[in-house]
Swiss-Prot record:
One of its GO terms (cellular component) is cytosolic large ribosomal subunit. Belongs to the eukaryotic ribosomal protein eL14 family. GO terms for molecular function: RNA binding; structural constituent of ribosome. GO terms for biological process: ribosomal large subunit biogenesis; translation. This is Large ribosomal subunit protein eL14. Keywords: Ribonucleoprotein, Ribosomal protein. NCBIfam families: PRK04333.1. Pfam families: KOW. It comes from the Archaea.
């Protein structure tokens, strides 16, 4: 199971959206991915994120590369993970 893959649900660990869950929509390069909440579900905007600032979970939704927010929302609802996405978690702060 690759940790960083399209459709993987992750927890943001840094920034103003820390603790919220998001879905990987596209892999930009070896350091950045495109994620979305989508915003209507939990308030996470579609944006580029450093892979060091997200923590993958064991859950995944089936979406295509570059899926729109509506497609992601439908995939989450079909998977029955809406409540899982909405609940915030306390992110693990890495020790530096």
């Amino acid at each position: 199971m690759p940790a960083i893959e399209i459709g993987r649900i992750c927890v943001k660990t840094r920034g103003r959206e820390a603790g919220k869950k998001c879905v990987i929509v596209d892999i930009i390069d070896s350091n950045f991915v495109l994620v979305t909440g989508p915003k209507e579900i939990n308030g996470v905007k579609r944006r580029r994120v450093n892979i060091l600032h997200i923590e993958p979970t064991d859950k995944k939704v089936e979406i295509n590369k570059g899926a729109t927010d509506q497609e992601v929302k439908q995939a989450i609802e079909q998977s029955g993970l809406t409540d899982f996405i909405k609940e915030a978690v306390k992110p693990k702060i890495p020790v530096i």
